[in-house]
Amino acid sequence: MKRTANPRELAVHTLTGLEQTGDFLREVLDLHIQQNPLSPVDRALYTELVYGTVRMRRSIDYVLSSFSRRPINKLPERILHNLRLAVYQIMYLDRVPNYAVVNEAVKLARRFGHQGTASFTNGVLRQVVRSKGRFEFPAKEDNIVEHLGVKHSFPNWIVEHWLDMFGAEETEQLCQAMNKTPELHVRVNTLRISAEDLSR
């Protein structure tokens, strides 16, 4: 029987593959799900981690750059993606305790590198955890385009376009709304399958 995949490790491989090939995210995601056995809970976590990290990458990289003593574009790819995934979980998800996120990321960093990369990962992520809820993005008063773009992970050109169209308040609301994960509701046709069988 095939061993169940680790959703975080699989997410690192997915993001690394995307960077190297430039393939479409949905196709890569579907392929990895087909090739790697995941429970429904782990599949949901894997999907959320990959989509969320891609969506919030600009914000995540700003946070990482604030705490990394090395330029993040000089880090080995898998170490960087492992850090990005962990920062996404710490900053934007609350289903897994921060200590567990850090612990898992450190284990993966050791597997992908060595004790030095594990210690580096641990140090960076502990600083991220300490800053949660009070991390300072670029000041709105200094540059509203940069503030909204970095904080909400949008390119400056689209923020400028929205500001011209809607003004500052509505643009910020739009940025927030665009980053909300839509709720998923599943209706089961019990004539074809039971809810219990569907959840397997």
Predicted regions and their residues:
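Class I Rossmann-like S-adenosyl-L-methionine
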Residues: M1-R200
